[in-house]
Amino acid sequence: ADLAFPHHENEIAQSEAANGCEFVHYWLHNGFINIDNKKMSKSLGNFFTVREAAAAYGYDCIRMFMLMSHYRSPLNYSGEILMQAKNALERLNTAKKNLEFFMANGKDGELTETETAFVAALPKFREKFCAAMDDDFNTADAIAAIFELVRDVNAAVSPASDPTKALAKVCYD
């Protein structure tokens, strides 16, 4: 009953009245937030604000937490799941720093034959990402495609592979 008619209609009417213009063309509303598999509720005493969660984990971590689930699904908030989101962000940041390092310190010269083949395979990740987003804004699968890309890029651009600056730059871009 929480999100039953006319909840969203009232949100739209209030926003349009306050701002004097059309609200939005697309609007997504995530599922309810559960705390350790129980509905979040002031009456249950398991209520928190976004500011409180951000103080503990950071806003980027909360964003990742939300992106890792489909927007129509309930979100299960727990310390363990927030740590998974934090670790996911750290993997992305580590990959970025790794690419930046090799853009500055990799071998000079053109892409090698192996690197050229790797670069030719990169569009498949964009295709997977776009397919997930086109599938009812499936951010969980889109994030999975990003992490497949990160895994392959980390293998291709590592000290063991002795990459060129050019490969690091292509992957970074």
Give residue spans per PLM region.
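Feature 926 captures the class I aminoacyl-tRNA synthetase adenylation module centered on the KMSKS loop
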Residues: 18-21, 55-56, 71-173
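Alpha-helical recognition segments enriched in aromatics with Gly/Pro capping
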Residues: 1-100
